[in-house]
Design a protein with these regions (language model features):
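Hydrophobic residues in well-ordered beta-strands that form the structural core
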Residues: 16, 59, 74, 97, ...
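Beta-loop-alpha module in the N-terminal Rossmann-like domain of NAD(P)-dependent dehydrogenases
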Residues: 55-110, 114
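Structural signature of beta-strand start/N-cap positions in the alpha/beta core
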Residues: 6, 31-32, 68-70, 93-94, ...
């Protein structure tokens, strides 16, 4: 692909290092050119493992947002998803934010409003809904196969 997307990662810890960066690297359509983490060593390690030769490293996400990037991945702790995403959208970046979208509906609405105001793409990593087991359960519920559900239990990774 001649014109690869230029992406930045904000938050180079667990989910970014374990899932996002390895997946992005295998796609071949996106170059990771910027890494930000409060722990500089994490960002430097991510650059060495997944970045382009000229990738940049930051501890302040606002400095990363000054770069000419097509998109940023927000992979930070849950409480920071909203304000980092809003800042990124206002900086003219498309955003893929890790789940959960925000810590409350008001923060989520700020994110939606910023995407609408800027005309930028905002996507949230709710990939679990496309898993075969999730799709099967959704289909069964919609078909009324489970009757009146009064209790459900699910397991998920939480921090």
């Amino acid at each position: 692909m001649a014109n690869k997307l230029k992406a930045g990662i904000i938050g180079c810890g667990g989910i970014a290092n374990g899932k996002h960066m390895p997946s992005i690297k295998t796609l071949g359509e996106t170059e990771l050119v910027a890494f930000c983490d409060l722990i500089i060593e994490r960002a430097e390690k991510a650059k060495a493992q997944y970045g382009t030769e000229d990738a940049q490293v930051f501890t302040d996400y606002k400095e990363l947002l000054k770069l000419d990037l097509d998109c940023v991945y927000v992979c930070t702790p849950n409480r920071s998803h909203s304000y980092i995403t809003v800042d990124a959208l206002h900086a003219g970046k498309n955003v893929m934010c890790e789940k959960p979208m925000a810590i409350n509906p008001a923060e989520a609405q700020k994110m939606l409003d910023a995407a609408k105001e800027t005309g930028k793409i905002l996507t949230i990593g709710y990939q679990g809904r496309y898993r075969p087991d999730s799709q099967y359960l959704k289909k069964e519920c919609e078909a009324g196969e489970l009757g009146d559900t009064y209790y459900a239990r699910a397991n998920a990774i939480r921090r």
